[in-house]
Amino acid sequence: MKALSKLHKEVGIWMTDVPAPELGHNDLLIKIRKTAICGTDIHIYNWDEWSQKTIPVPMVVGHEYVGEVVAIGQEVRGFAVGDRVSGEGHITCGHCRNCRAGRTHLCRNTIGVGVNRPGAFAEYLVIPAFNAFKLPDNVPDELAAIFDPFGNAVHTALSFDLVGEDVLITGAGPIGIMAAAVCRHVGARHVVITDVNEYRLELARKMGATRAVNVTKEQLSGVMSELGMTEGFDVGLEMSGVPSAFQDMIDKMNHGGKIAMLGIPPATMAIDWGKVIFKGLFIKGIYGREMFETWYKMASLIQSGLDLSPIITHRFHIDDFQQGFDAMRSGQSGKVILSWDK
């Protein structure tokens, strides 16, 4: 079958022909319809330090997808051939303490689809049926293909009560922008997002951010004054992994403020812990999506009118995958969809 693979320990992704995956007793075989390019895929493409330590070569990559079930393992219940599904890209062990306690997103033995095992940039994908999510009919394929990163946004944004709160989001990548849309949809008062990329800040404005701030041109303190904020932000969502952005967030938080961190900073990051302590800040690390509460919330948010369509800015056939990767690497895109239809 046709697949996109990391074939060489250098910059690039290559179209290859690989054997179709084998179906296990508890698995689903999914015919892929659409996939989306993730920031992780760009790290793998660029063959950065993380990729060199993590990705076995060769490896079929990709983990954001929607497809149709075409075969079912003999032990599987609850799915049928023809079901339209997306799926959780974190394969968990099922036997560690967190898995047994129902906190599967915190499994210490997690294996990543398209990272540690063959991924979704292929004509067919096999995953455990446990990881599949059956999609409502009114969730279109393009949105279903980005449920993985949308789930990161939902998990992060809904970590804290948002109704009537003022929210600061640092990092206007696609996940940060979707988080801004979620915050507004569920009732936040002001949602301010910061970045240095004007293209993506404009996307954030289209998605409902109260203010999208280029921190090279504008001070957050001035924006807060314009919005009539006198006590700081109630909730912070750190999506950038940039130390200076996190420092600024800590400075601008209200006493008792709550911060959820999804962005991955450098290996070490110095912060003023005195401010954290004396402000009584709560900081929570976010990894992946809660299985499967986040997935049900994603579907419900879309069904209740949340419009994510502006975040999808580029669409290509899989044969033109290089154009898709070029668009993502340029920084002048939102989400990029690759279609696998003939």
Swiss-Prot record:
<comment type="pathway">
    <text>Amino-acid degradation; L-threonine degradation via oxydo-reductase pathway; glycine from L-threonine: step 1/2.</text>
</comment>
<feature type="binding site">
    <location>
        <position position="99"/>
    </location>
    <ligand>
        <name>Zn(2+) 2</name>
    </ligand>
</feature>
<feature type="site" description="Important for catalytic activity for the proton relay mechanism but does not participate directly in the coordination of zinc atom">
    <location>
        <position position="148"/>
    </location>
</feature>
<dbReference type="GO" id="GO:0008743">
    <property type="term" value="F:L-threonine 3-dehydrogenase activity"/>
</dbReference>
<feature type="active site" description="Charge relay system">
    <location>
        <position position="40"/>
    </location>
</feature>
<feature type="binding site">
    <location>
        <position position="96"/>
    </location>
    <ligand>
        <name>Zn(2+) 2</name>
    </ligand>
</feature>
<feature type="binding site">
    <location>
        <position position="38"/>
    </location>
    <ligand>
        <name>Zn(2+) 1</name>
    </ligand>
</feature>
<dbReference type="Pfam" id="PF08240">
    <property type="entry name" value="ADH_N"/>
</dbReference>
<dbReference type="GO" id="GO:0019518">
    <property type="term" value="P:L-threonine catabolic process to glycine"/>
</dbReference>
<feature type="binding site">
    <location>
        <position position="175"/>
    </location>
    <ligand>
        <name>NAD(+)</name>
    </ligand>
</feature>
<keyword id="KW-0862">Zinc</keyword>
<feature type="binding site">
    <location>
        <begin position="262"/>
        <end position="264"/>
    </location>
    <ligand>
        <name>NAD(+)</name>
    </ligand>
</feature>
<dbReference type="InterPro" id="IPR020843">
    <property type="entry name" value="PKS_ER"/>
</dbReference>
<dbReference type="InterPro" id="IPR002328">
    <property type="entry name" value="ADH_Zn_CS"/>
</dbReference>
<dbReference type="InterPro" id="IPR004627">
    <property type="entry name" value="L-Threonine_3-DHase"/>
</dbReference>
<dbReference type="InterPro" id="IPR011032">
    <property type="entry name" value="GroES-like_sf"/>
</dbReference>
<keyword id="KW-0963">Cytoplasm</keyword>
<dbReference type="InterPro" id="IPR050129">
    <property type="entry name" value="Zn_alcohol_dh"/>
</dbReference>
<keyword id="KW-0560">Oxidoreductase</keyword>
<feature type="binding site">
    <location>
        <position position="195"/>
    </location>
    <ligand>
        <name>NAD(+)</name>
    </ligand>
</feature>
<dbReference type="GO" id="GO:0005737">
    <property type="term" value="C:cytoplasm"/>
</dbReference>
<dbReference type="InterPro" id="IPR013154">
    <property type="entry name" value="ADH-like_N"/>
</dbReference>
<protein>
    <recommendedName>
        <fullName>L-threonine 3-dehydrogenase</fullName>
        <ecNumber>1.1.1.103</ecNumber>
    </recommendedName>
</protein>
<feature type="binding site">
    <location>
        <position position="107"/>
    </location>
    <ligand>
        <name>Zn(2+) 2</name>
    </ligand>
</feature>
<comment type="subunit">
    <text>Homotetramer.</text>
</comment>
<feature type="active site" description="Charge relay system">
    <location>
        <position position="43"/>
    </location>
</feature>
<dbReference type="GO" id="GO:0008270">
    <property type="term" value="F:zinc ion binding"/>
</dbReference>
<dbReference type="InterPro" id="IPR036291">
    <property type="entry name" value="NAD(P)-bd_dom_sf"/>
</dbReference>
<keyword id="KW-0520">NAD</keyword>
<dbReference type="InterPro" id="IPR013149">
    <property type="entry name" value="ADH-like_C"/>
</dbReference>
<feature type="binding site">
    <location>
        <position position="200"/>
    </location>
    <ligand>
        <name>NAD(+)</name>
    </ligand>
</feature>
<feature type="binding site">
    <location>
        <begin position="286"/>
        <end position="287"/>
    </location>
    <ligand>
        <name>NAD(+)</name>
    </ligand>
</feature>
<feature type="binding site">
    <location>
        <position position="64"/>
    </location>
    <ligand>
        <name>Zn(2+) 1</name>
    </ligand>
</feature>
<comment type="function">
    <text>Catalyzes the NAD(+)-dependent oxidation of L-threonine to 2-amino-3-ketobutyrate.</text>
</comment>
<feature type="binding site">
    <location>
        <position position="63"/>
    </location>
    <ligand>
        <name>Zn(2+) 1</name>
    </ligand>
</feature>
<keyword id="KW-0479">Metal-binding</keyword>
<comment type="similarity">
    <text>Belongs to the zinc-containing alcohol dehydrogenase family.</text>
</comment>
<feature type="binding site">
    <location>
        <position position="93"/>
    </location>
    <ligand>
        <name>Zn(2+) 2</name>
    </ligand>
</feature>
<dbReference type="Pfam" id="PF00107">
    <property type="entry name" value="ADH_zinc_N"/>
</dbReference>
